[in-house]
Amino acid sequence: MVYLTRIEHFNAAHKLYNPDWTPEKNEEVFGRCANANWHGHNFELYVTIKGKPDPDTGFIFDAKKLGALVQEHITDKLDHRNLNVDVDFMRGKMCSIENLEVAIWNELEPRLPAFAKLHCLKLVET
């Protein structure tokens, strides 16, 4: 088994806010991330797949195709967007990094070919 990691970048805004809580509790728990006017980050997304290299190509999956898949289904939908408002697969969810990673996983996993398994995601927020 070998692993291939592709790194993609995007910029996006979001806020962490629980509507069932008071503004004071939201600020206590989420701090500046609960800002009513949102806040932005630069993100690095590491997508790692695993599999056995094809004997003819030496690839698990062509890295360019993996990049195109991630761009089409993830980064093009997230880049320069408000994650809470503009991204279908994040609507109605608390927009934490952890929930964003789960949503990205759910978007990517079924789109990969059977011979390339999604192994892990790493999302870096700066």
Where are the model-predicted features located?
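Charge-rich, low-complexity N-terminal segments
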Residues: 1-126
